[in-house]
């Protein structure tokens, strides 16, 4: 009996490991039914346990909006303030699986003031579900979330036209919304894959089970589409990208370079190039925490041992021997600003790029994007939740790809010099291939260095708040 249980468990584990993972997010206007949709997916795929259902029934009586029925939106509206207001504030993540696939869902806020939260959720997703209220049609928030999804590199959009039960399942309404969105989508990226599904998240129609109330719709259910869609990886399987995250030297006999293989393949005996030093070497070993490998694939966490003794630092890149990738010191980026302190030309920040922290200087704000109309607006600053395009200088040449070519090596986060708080997320549009000395603000550099000295060695002085006010003045 025990042997059979072990065999069955091993088979189950093997099956789980072979399943592909799809990460998607839900977004749209407030009260379009994002949280209800996720709750319905989890409920109808039997992912909610009995004890969770018990507490869900109890919470539905206190906070729910469905009378005596279970309010499935409460499955993901976890914060007390969310349940009281009936809205989503933070990004809520949920995990579930079916017999065909594993899923990670990000339920993102619909309010404009939570644009930064939505951008955070979209940054790691492969697909976006845009909820549209069939009674209201497309809204400004629908346009904004469509644009942010594509800005963050998402190529697959499902336009879920929800609450069809409230418009008597009329095909004409569905077709009009579909037509309007297709016209709008011409302003977005050219290589989008868009599918339209009429549904009712509240009643569970066309979510997991096909409804008979919309015979004019001949397509598949939402779950069926999610289970079968094949996401084309925008990362080239040929272009090797291995940024060094850690120098692994447990003893004098071993020196390895640890990190995640972001793209391409690596094998023992392969000749590689190390950037930015532009030095060639050969892979002698590839090891993990428990074994040695002959080759490594995208996404694997590995430690690489080289044949030659080379001075390699955190943030250096291993690339193909024939790679044309070169260090650059200037770039144009799209940025989502995430703090109350406004972004101005001339400011300096730390950025984290492929595991490497480096100083950048904001040379110029090219424009701000009105995400509701997609118009470029001339601006000298960016405020909280603004999206714009800026030109930046790095303090020294660094390695990166364009975000459209490789999301992993083309993204960066901006970090405040004084508080170490993440203040922005950047997506590299292109390199300007210029090298030079970074313009500096000597007074501000001195103040930030002085601030670091005080909080590290003299925290009892209680000076940081005074300094911060002075710097931000």
UniProtKB/Swiss-Prot annotation:
Domain of life the protein comes from: Bacteria
Pathway, per record: Sulfur metabolism; hydrogen sulfide biosynthesis; sulfite from sulfate: step 1/3
Stated name of the protein: Sulfate adenylyltransferase subunit 1
Record's catalysed reaction(s): sulfate + ATP + H(+) = adenosine 5'-phosphosulfate + diphosphate
UniProt-listed NCBIfam families: CysN (TIGR02034), PRK05124.1 (NF003478), small_GTP (TIGR00231)
E.C. code: 2.7.7.4
Gene3D superfamilies with a match to the protein in the record: P-loop containing nucleotide triphosphate hydrolases, Translation factors
Domain tr-type G: 19-238
Record text on subunit structure and interactions: Heterodimer composed of CysD, the smaller subunit, and CysN.
Upper taxonomic lineage: Bacteria, Pseudomonadati, Pseudomonadota, Gammaproteobacteria, Enterobacterales
PANTHER family per UniProt: TRANSLATION FACTOR
GO MF annotations in UniProt: ATP binding; GTP binding; GTPase activity; sulfate adenylyltransferase (ATP) activity
G5, as annotated region: 200-202
Region G4: start-end pairs: 162-165
Gene that produces this protein: cysN
Family: Belongs to the TRAFAC class translation factor GTPase superfamily. Classic translation factor GTPase family. CysN/NodQ subfamily.
Family matches, as Pfam families: GTP-eEF1A_C (PF22594), GTP_EFTU (PF00009)
Function: With CysD forms the ATP sulfurylase (ATPS) that catalyzes the adenylation of sulfate producing adenosine 5'-phosphosulfate (APS) and diphosphate, the first enzymatic step in sulfur assimilation pathway. APS synthesis involves the formation of a high-energy phosphoric-sulfuric acid anhydride bond driven by GTP hydrolysis by CysN coupled to ATP hydrolysis by CysD.
UniProt-annotated stretches for the region G2: 86-90
PROSITE patterns linked: G_TR_1 (PS00301), G_TR_2 (PS51722)
Top EC group: transferase
Sequence segments annotated as region (G3): 107-110
Ranges where the record places region G1: 28-35
Organism whose genome encodes this protein: Buchnera aphidicola subsp. Acyrthosiphon pisum (strain Tuc7)
Keywords carried by this UniProt record: ATP-binding, GTP-binding, Nucleotide-binding, Nucleotidyltransferase, Transferase
């Amino acid at each position: 009996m025990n042997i059979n249980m072990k065999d069955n468990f091993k088979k189950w584990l093997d099956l789980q490991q072979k399943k592909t993972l799809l990460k998607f997010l839900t977004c749209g206007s407030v009260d379009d039914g994002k949280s209800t949709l996720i709750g319905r997916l989890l409920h109808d795929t039997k992912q909610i346990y009995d004890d969770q259902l018990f507490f869900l029934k109890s919470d539905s009586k206190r906070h729910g909006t469905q009378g005596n029925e279970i309010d499935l939106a409460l499955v993901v509206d976890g914060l007390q303030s969310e349940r009281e207001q009936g809205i989503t504030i933070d990004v809520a993540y949920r995990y579930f699986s079916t017999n065909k696939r594993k899923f990670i869902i990000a339920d993102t806020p619909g309010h404009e003031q939570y644009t930064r939260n939505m951008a955070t959720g979209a940054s790691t997703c492969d697909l976006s579900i845009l909820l549209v209220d069939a009674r209201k049609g497309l809204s400004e928030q629908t346009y904004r979330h469509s644009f942010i999804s594509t800005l963050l590199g998402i190529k697959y959009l499902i336009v879920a036209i929800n609450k069809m039960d409230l418009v008597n399942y009329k095909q004409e309404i569905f077709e009009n919304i579909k037509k309007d969105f297709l016209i709008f989508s011409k302003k977005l990226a050219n290589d989008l894959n868009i599918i339209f599904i009429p549904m009712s998240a509240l009643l569970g129609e066309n979510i997991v089970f096909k409804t008979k109330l919309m015979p004019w719709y001949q397509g598949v259910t939402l779950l069926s589409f999610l289970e079968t869609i094949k996401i084309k990886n925008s990362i080239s399987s040929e272009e090797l990208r291995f940024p060094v995250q850690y120098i692994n030297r447990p003893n004098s006999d071993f020196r390895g370079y640890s990190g995640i293989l972001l793209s391409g393949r690596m094998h023992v005996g392969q000749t590689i190039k190390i950037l930015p030093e532009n030095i060639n070497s050969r892979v002698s070993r590839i090891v993990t925490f428990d074994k040695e490998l002959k080759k490594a694939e995208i996404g694997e966490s590995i430690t690489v041992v080289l044949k030659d003794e080379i001075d390699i630092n955190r943030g250096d890149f291993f690339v193909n021997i024939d790679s044309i990738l070169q260090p650059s010191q200037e770039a144009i980026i799209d940025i989502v600003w995430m703090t109350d302190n406004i972004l101005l030309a001339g400011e300096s920040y730390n950025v984290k790029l492929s595991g490497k922290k480096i100083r950048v200087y904001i040379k110029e704000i090219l424009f701000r994007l009105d995400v509701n109309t997609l118009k470029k607006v001339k601006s000298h600053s960016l405020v909280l939740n603004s999206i714009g395009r800026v030109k930046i200088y790095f303090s020294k040449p660094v390695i990166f790809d364009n975000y459209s070519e490789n999301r992993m090596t083309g993204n960066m986060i901006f970090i405040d010099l004084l508080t170490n708080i993440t203040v922005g997320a950047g997506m590299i549009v292109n390199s300007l291939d210029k090298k030079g000395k970074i313009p500096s603000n000597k007074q501000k550099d001195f103040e930030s260095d002085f601030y670091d000295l005080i909080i590290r060695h003299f925290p009892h002085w209680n000076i940081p708040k005074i300094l911060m006010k002075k710097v931000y003045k």
